[in-house]
């Protein structure tokens, strides 16, 4: 113990010799050992107090700014509601536009279908194919197919189509009550077109037809248009000495003259004389087309009345089907067509060109065989089948015009 005391005294003496600064540092460290804990606690207390103050102030600020936030939130909600409302309005408007467009499209489509039926499309196709075939007959070589020829052909075709629509439209105007029985699907009989609309269409296409004919300057074309107008009007108009469709012979004569004679001769002359500037000269194909189409047009004129017997009888139309009965008229029509095909086969066999001979003989033979096969199974009492067979005869009519240019 004495040794320990002596060592401590020696250490104190050494520190004293080193200087008072070291002694004060050691003594200061000894003094701060207890007071440091109190300082930390005091500092922690001050921090807690400051935090509490900040919390109170933040709470006060939050309370002060809460109305603004509520207002801002309310504004945001109102804006969202407004956007939703605008979106709904836009959707409704878009839906209205779509519905309006669909309604307009449906209405336009309905009117176009009605106009298509008003034009009697099977007659339109017959006019197009017939005039096209006849217009090819004067052509001698590929050099004849020029822009001038195309222009002359289109003028004749457009004028003839407009006159065709006038004739069939006029017939519908005077046959509304009859068509309600015989052809209830036609637009005037079905009420899809008003009488005023029918009159407007008929007059418009008549004016267009004559305008095109006058502009072309073709005498044969104008002759064809004038005769078609006169015969078509006499066939349908209810007036003294008119309404020729009441009489079987006059009705058949109108159709035969226009379809068989006028179309072949007038449009052939238009292309050869007016367009090609050549002297008018008949050809073998032209003579054959005229004679064959006389038979075919007579069949069309007679057969078209077979499904219309009921309405024609009720309104006093004395067609051959009303007088003789549908069965007899049907047998007569089939006999005429088969005889015409037989004659066409003989004419084709007399051709000096092998290719033309093969086409005309085989073509007419095939058409005759098809006709005979279908005619065997037809029930005349079935109006729907008779109407379908009538459309089949028109298809044979179209096919014949494809064979006529090969008859040479």
UniProtKB/Swiss-Prot annotation:
State the family named in the UniProt similarity comment for this chain.
Belongs to the UbiA prenyltransferase family.
Q: What is its EC number?
A: 2.5.1.116
Q: Please verify whether the record's keywords include RNA-binding.
A: no
**Reactions catalysed, as given in the entry:** homogentisate + (2E,6E,10E)-geranylgeranyl diphosphate + H(+) = 6-geranylgeranyl-2-methylbenzene-1,4-diol + CO2 + diphosphate
UniProt protein name: Homogentisate geranylgeranyltransferase
**Molecular-function annotations in GO:** homogentisate geranylgeranyltransferase activity
Quote the InterPro entries the UniProt record gives.
AtHST-like, UbiA_prenyltransferase, UbiA_sf
Pfam families, per the entry: UbiA (PF01040)
This entry carries the following GO cellular component terms, namely:
chloroplast membrane
Mind telling me which residue stretches traverse the membrane in this protein? 122-142, 149-169, 194-214, 217-237, 248-268, 286-306, 329-349, 352-372, 386-406
What topology in the membrane does the UniProt record assign? Multi-pass membrane protein
The pathway it acts in is: Cofactor biosynthesis; tocopherol biosynthesis
Further remarks about this protein from its record = Seeds of most monocots are enriched in tocotrienols and contain only small amounts of tocopherols.
Q: Where is the transit peptide?
A: 1-68
Q: Where in the cell is it found?
A: Plastid, Chloroplast membrane
What broad class describes the main subcellular location of this protein?
plastid
Kindly give the PANTHER family that the UniProt entry links to this protein: HOMOGENTISATE GERANYLGERANYLTRANSFERASE, CHLOROPLASTIC, HOMOGENTISATE SOLANESYLTRANSFERASE, CHLOROPLASTIC
Source organism of the structure? Triticum aestivum (Wheat)
Indicate the enzyme's highest-level EC class. Answer: transferase
Give the GO biological process terms: vitamin E biosynthetic process
**Purpose:** Involved in the synthesis of tocotrienol (vitamin E). Catalyzes the condensation of homogentisate and geranylgeranyl diphosphate to form 2-methyl-6-geranylgeranylbenzoquinol. Possesses low activity with phytyl diphosphate as substrate.
- Keyword Ribosomal protein found: no
Q: Which UniProt keywords apply?
A: Chloroplast, Membrane, Plastid, Transferase, Transit peptide, Transmembrane, Transmembrane helix
């Amino acid at each position: 113990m004495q040794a320990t005391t002596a060592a401590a005294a020696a250490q104190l003496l050494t520190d004293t010799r080193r200087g008072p600064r070291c002694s004060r540092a050691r003594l200061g460290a000894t003094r701060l050992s207890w007071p440091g804990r109190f300082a930390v606690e005091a500092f922690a207390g001050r921090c807690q107090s400051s935090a509490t103050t900040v919390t109170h102030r933040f709470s006060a600020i939050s309370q002060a700014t809460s109305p603004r936030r509520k207002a801002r939130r309310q504004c945001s909600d109102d804006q969202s509601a407004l956007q939703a409302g605008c979106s709904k309005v836009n959707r409704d408007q878009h839906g209205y536009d779509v519905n309006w467009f669909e309604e307009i499209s449906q209405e336009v489509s309905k009117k176009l279908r009605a106009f298509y039926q008003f034009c009697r499309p099977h007659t339109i196709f017959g006019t197009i194919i017939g005039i096209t075939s006849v217009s090819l007959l004067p052509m001698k070589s590929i050099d004849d197919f020029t822009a001038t020829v195309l222009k002359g052909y289109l003028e004749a075709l457009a004028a003839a189509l407009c006159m065709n629509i006038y004739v069939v439209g006029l017939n519908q105007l005077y046959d509304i009550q009859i068509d309600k029985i015989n052809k209830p699907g036609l637009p005037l009989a079905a009420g899809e077109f008003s009488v005023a609309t029918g009159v407007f269409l008929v007059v418009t296409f008549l004016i267009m037809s004559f305008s095109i004919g006058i502009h072309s300057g073709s005498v044969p074309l104008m002759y064809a248009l004038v005769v078609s107008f006169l015969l078509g009007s006499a066939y349908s108009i209810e007036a003294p000495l008119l309404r020729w469709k009441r009489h079987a012979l006059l009705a058949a004569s109108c159709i035969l003259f226009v379809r068989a004679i006028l179309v072949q001769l007038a449009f052939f002359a238009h292309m050869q004389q007016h367009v090609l500037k050549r002297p008018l000269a008949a050809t073998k194909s032209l003579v054959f087309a005229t004679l064959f189409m006389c038979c075919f047009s007579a069949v069309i004129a007679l057969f078209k009345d077979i499904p219309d017997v009921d309405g024609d009888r009720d309104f006093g139309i004395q067609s051959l089907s009303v007088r003789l009965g549908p069965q007899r008229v049907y047998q007569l029509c089939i006999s005429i067509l088969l005889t015409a095909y037989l004659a066409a086969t003989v004419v084709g066999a007399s051709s000096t060109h092998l290719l033309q001979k093969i086409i005309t003989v085989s073509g007419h033979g095939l058409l005759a065989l098809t006709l005979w096969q279908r005619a065997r199974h037809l029930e005349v009492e079935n109006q729907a089948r008779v109407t379908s067979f009538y459309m089949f005869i028109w298809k044979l009519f179209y096919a014949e015009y494809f064979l006529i240019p090969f008859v040479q």
